[in-house]
């Protein structure tokens, strides 16, 4: 039926059957030539689902200008359809969000490290994701040119989310970019007259409201708010980072869940500081790391936890879980927020191993390269606010732990020693604990053990 209609239309245009046959034959040749669809060898196929449709049967008379325009329209349409299909055959690859750890389900796309059109190498970072704990890089799966980003900065993404399309060859990228720009130019052309038509309508509405503006109520309201305007102009509103949100949530949950109580004591740092100054050079020559005060407090905390195992325990529902291991978390303040890496097996480490672990974890935390596994777990936390000059504080428990030890600055104060008043380097220490699980007696005994070990480190050698 369609063939008869075409023959009748050709006859009505004054062309003979022989002429139509020639035009039909020429149109078939034109349809099979590469000029109709660049990039195809024998013809264009459009894949939809599991079916392939050939366009060789679009025979168009060469003498008809209207049909020629239709042919060009079909050609341009097929070109746009084939490009995404060719991308699926291996011309492009997709960069996706990697696995971020068992305890992290999503993150925020913090920033793009590359721009569309830039060339990237395989495994080169193109974007960064900020999670509750660490910052993770999204790497390019192959070398090529970034065609486009599929998400925006600030979007919440999950593992497997497609972030960018990367073209393996520059030719494919150059073919896609013009097709993406065409709809932008066509969309922008009709918009100006529409805006021009809407402008007089928008202007007409305020004209009617203008006489109502200079009424008596507005002036007193503005005069009342005038003193508040200058402070607002000096304010800055910055969205919270994922890490800051997570820290805020966990600390508030800790405050709402635990029965927090803090007990204090003071420690004479004379002997520990003397030990450090006496052996710091030999310690560095042998172990390649400086001897600090933190390792002495870690060893003292381990000894106190072994004497008071309930401080190392945790409440789980109606049960108490006693941990037979000691994993010490250390609070590290960074420019992005507070992170708490873990010294695993601290009860089996010596001073050198503890110092090396602390330096390594602190360096990774400040550089933002610390992994999630290095911050997971922990049975007890030690926080040193003394490095910032804190004299005394009440630290908050890091859940799901039950206690935290707070160190503070060393201050020379007059103390009575042997009946005489002498200056001594003193430090206040604080233990915040969950009073649901830990009684005051255990908390005081814990701090007394820390005090005894720090003031007389030889107790560790004799195990007394």
UniProtKB/Swiss-Prot annotation:
UniProt transit peptide range: 1-85
Chain residue ranges for the region called Disordered: 167-243
Taxonomic superkingdom: Eukaryota
Domain Lipoyl-binding: 92-167
Catalytic activities: N(6)-[(R)-dihydrolipoyl]-L-lysyl-[protein] + succinyl-CoA = N(6)-[(R)-S(8)-succinyldihydrolipoyl]-L-lysyl-[protein] + CoA
InterPro entries registered for this protein in UniProt: 2-oxoA_DH_lipoyl-BS, 2-oxoacid_dehydrogenase, 2-oxoacid_DH_actylTfrase, Biotin_lipoyl, CAT-like_dom_sf, Single_hybrid_motif, SucB
Subcellular location: Mitochondrion
Pathway(s): Amino-acid degradation; L-lysine degradation via saccharopine pathway; glutaryl-CoA from L-lysine: step 6/6
Cofactor binding note from Swiss-Prot or TrEMBL: Binds 1 lipoyl cofactor covalently.
Listed Polar residues bias regions: 172-189
Molecular functions (GO terms): dihydrolipoyllysine-residue succinyltransferase activity; zinc ion binding
Active site per the UniProt annotation: 435, 439
GO cellular component terms listed in the entry, alphabetical order: cytosol; mitochondrion; oxoglutarate dehydrogenase complex
EC code(s) of this entry: 2.3.1.61
SUPFAM superfamilies: CoA-dependent acyltransferases, Single hybrid motif
Listed CDD domains: lipoyl_domain
GO biological process: L-lysine catabolic process to acetyl-CoA via saccharopine; tricarboxylic acid cycle
Assembly information from the UniProt record: Forms a 24-polypeptide structural core with octahedral symmetry.
Record-stated family: Belongs to the 2-oxoacid dehydrogenase family.
Protein's recorded name: Dihydrolipoyllysine-residue succinyltransferase component of 2-oxoglutarate dehydrogenase complex 2, mitochondrial
Source organism per UniProt: Arabidopsis thaliana (Mouse-ear cress)
Highest classification ranks of the organism: Eukaryota, Viridiplantae, Streptophyta, Embryophyta, Tracheophyta
